[in-house]
């Protein structure tokens, strides 16, 4: 049986500066066009953009068979 060599430690991720995500304008024409196709009404629009309200019904997770 051949002898096992030493396993060196691999190069880990460098802990440099993280790149910040650019601030996205949710009112830009491209965002509005996207919202036009995915939202069905104003409440849905606000929900998709992250503006939830306290009494909102919870969505069903997964699909039922």
UniProtKB/Swiss-Prot annotation:
InterPro entries linked to this entry: SMKR1
Residue ranges, annotated region (Disordered): 1-24
Residue spans of biased composition, Basic residues class: 1-20
Signal peptide location: none
PANTHER family per record: SMALL LYSINE-RICH PROTEIN 1 (PTHR37932:SF1)
Protein name: Small lysine-rich protein 1
